[in-house]
């Protein structure tokens, strides 16, 4: 009698195992797009309000690096810019006297020409005024050339300083630490009053609303799977607690890899599998690293 009970128990266990195997087509773990935010400036970290578990929207400022030296440098460059602009010549005012002389000489030349026609002046007087006008016009051309060269040189200096100001403003902007995506802080790597250097990790953030299940398929399953297909995803909360979600296949690996030890497939003989990523809208219950199952 005891042997019969043992046989029935083993048979029930076998049937249960076989039945559960058909409940899913693939397994995997949940992951998200994680971004490690690093410092883009060097200086004392004034504050970093990015604690683990906090949620932020894209662009929110969460930290600040010392900006005093950069601010002073910007003020210096602005003063330099003002000095350069003050040296810029007023061309109209500086050539006004020469143009007035040319106008006067032109009137005298015209008067002498009229007198010459009336035989009240001689030719030499007209030639003298023509010569005087030529001298004044050459003088005006020289002034315009000199003032133009000076203006061009000052414009180049002004442009150079403006570029330096833009560089400092960009560096100042990088002292303000912002979050790059809508997401949740997963880890914090720095604290206020520490020295931040370019490239030093400050915190890690992930988009926990739009996550992925990385599952693994055998080659025989690839025929029935296409990008964009909707599938049923089960989040495994342990103790046989499964919650189903709708997912969409967004990526299929182009090459096979050896089956990860923690992954089960519907073909235990398969030693190579293809990874797929299934996009899932998280309702807040799915955690990173949690196991999941897929039904096509």
Question: Each PLM stretch: what is its role?
Answer:
Residues 23-25, 178-179, 235-246:
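Short coil-to-beta-strand transition motifs
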Residues 217-243, 270-294:
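Surface-exposed connector loops and short turns at secondary-structure junctions
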Residues 2-12:
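Sec-dependent signal peptide recognition
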Residues 23-25, 72, 76-87, 93, ...:
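Extended amphipathic alpha-helical segments
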Residues 38, 255-266:
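Short, solvent-exposed secondary-structure boundary/capping segments
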Residues 23-87, 118, 124, 188-191, ...:
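Long, amphipathic coiled-coil "stalk"/hairpin helices in large membrane-associated assemblies
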Residues 14-17:
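C-terminal motif of bacterial Sec signal peptides marking the signal peptidase cleavage site
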Residues 29, 45-51, 55-61, 167-171, ...:
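Surface-exposed patches in structured soluble domains
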């Amino acid at each position: 009698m005891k042997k019969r009970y043992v046989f029935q128990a083993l048979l029930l266990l076998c049937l249960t195992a076989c039945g559960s195997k058909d409940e899913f087509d693939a397994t995997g773990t949940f992951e998200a797009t994680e971004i490690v935010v690093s410092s883009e400036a060097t200086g004392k970290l004034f504050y970093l309000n990015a604690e683990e578990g906090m949620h932020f929207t894209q662009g929110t400022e969460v930290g600040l690096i010392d900006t005093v030296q950069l601010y002073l440098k910007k003020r210096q460059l602005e003063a330099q810019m003002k000095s350069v602009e003050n040296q810029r010549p007023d061309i109209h005012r500086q050539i006004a006297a020469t143009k007035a002389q040319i106008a006067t000489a032109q009137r005298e030349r015209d008067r002498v020409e009229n007198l010459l026609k009336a035989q009240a002046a001689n030719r030499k007087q007209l030639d003298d005024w023509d010569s005087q006008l030529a001298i004044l016009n050459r003088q005006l051309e020289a002034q315009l050339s000199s003032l133009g060269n000076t203006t061009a040189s000052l414009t180049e200096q002004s442009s150079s300083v403006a570029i330096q100001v833009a560089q400092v403003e960009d560096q100042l902007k990088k002292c303000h630490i912002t979050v790059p995506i809508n997401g949740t802080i997963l880890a914090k790597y720095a604290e206020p009053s520490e020295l931040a250097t370019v490239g030093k990790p400050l915190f890690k953030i992930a988009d926990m609303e739009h996550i992925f299940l990385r599952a693994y398929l055998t080659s025989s399953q690839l025929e029935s799977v296409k990008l964009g297909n909707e599938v049923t995803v089960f989040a495994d909360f342990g103790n046989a607690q499964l919650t189903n979600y709708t997912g969409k296949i967004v990526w299929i690996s182009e090459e096979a890899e050896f089956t990860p030890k923690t992954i089960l497939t519907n073909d235990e003989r398969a030693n190579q599998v293809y990874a797929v990523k299934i996009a899932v809208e998280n309702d807040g219950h799915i955690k990173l690293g949690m196991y999941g199952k897929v039904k096509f």
